[in-house]
């Protein structure tokens, strides 16, 4: 890798590996990046469902302005609005959900009405009246739809300031019957709120109209229902009395959160966290990390038990990995009984082949996970010896670029082993010029080294290999490295776990299209459309959500 001409001798991130203009959008080429820009798939959309529609004339006899919102039962509207109320029975205004119609004092206007869906639409049919006539189905501009309810099927959404574009694959919301909370909106009694909902059926919390980005579900516009602290559905929320196809019931006790125009993802699982201070917890939450797997220094059992109690009030999932520091019978059992979610083998406490073998045998017998930080001194074993000790059993190998510790300089060779699940940490992703420099201080600080001791500096510098750092991105792109975590309070920062993962996906999009990737196995369908990176984004999101959850045995609960 060469340096740029104006910085001789310096390494630039992936310099020369991608074209100067790697299919960037017009906004990026002009320097005017529109954060979260949306490319609309249509110019307009039909309003609401295909139901009976009529129009009638309404006159305001009041001395005051009267407004009626979209889903208010028109037949029950202000008595000083004069119109054929029998004809309006079972209908509501045919306008966007959450909008309203205004009548000035004395004003008369013709309005369109649409029949309610659900039970109301079926049970409260009234005969046609001479005061009404059929009305066409109105349309709403795609721009207004986006402003009110967020993107819909086929729309493309840019992730932040990256060159990654999501394509909305499906819209499960109730078009025309959206639950919208606020002044004059639809999430009220007799509208999208089901007043007779039972406690067992109504949601505790509704996240309405979010763009769900999930490695399993895909990219779906949907309402998210929460009950008893768990997500119980991703679908269509509302009141079955007035809307069709409702599978998530909004009741009088449901707390609404408006997700229109927002992205909802699974909470990230940071599977390498040194939890040495509670100050990490708000940082994790603010950055989208909701599950922490600690890095294995939480023993003795008394401390583990007290730690779990102390963290009980935090809205986070905490898994304490215990340090596997001895293969003496009975010691690991004590840690499991104290609440350990798994074990961590670390070179600072010994990563000998016989210890690796014993701990993996114990983990297999007790169905728990093991994470591994290998012997960087080569004091007891080299890479091949560690692989032999693992013997085809499943283990999670941390920071395989080697800078965080482990066999030097060839730790990355672990990616060849099918049973070894490799991860890398945020401070080297995506690779940049400051990464090698930063890690000299990091390694000394976190591993008991001293600047004044030449031997300590020599050990540190032997660990830092810019070439393996630079190789991490392409190996992630090929799937050889499957997890991103932070090594917070060790190598990295918990506030960067999600952000660095997405930045890596962005960088690798450019690398994949550049000359450095020629001859590398590709994903052809993904390369066809520069405005559809959906599969890439889902793959990379899995690296900090689903994949670590599976590896640590908690995917039934999180990820």
Label each residue range with its predicted role.
Residues 56-64:
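Asparagine-centered strand-capping/turn motif at beta-strand->loop junctions
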Residues 65-87:
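Short acidic, flexible loop segments centered on an aromatic residue
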Residues 83-119:
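Intrinsically disordered, low-complexity Pro/Gly/Ser/Thr-rich segments with frequent PxxP/GP/PP motifs
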Residues 110-136:
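Terminal connector regions
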Residues 135-196, 235-236, 246-247, 251-265, ...:
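Divalent-metal coordination cores built from histidine and acidic residues
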Residues 213-223, 535-541, 549-559:
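Acidic, glycine-enriched loop/beta-strand segments at the rims
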Residues 345-538, 544-552:
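Active-site core of metal-dependent hydrolases
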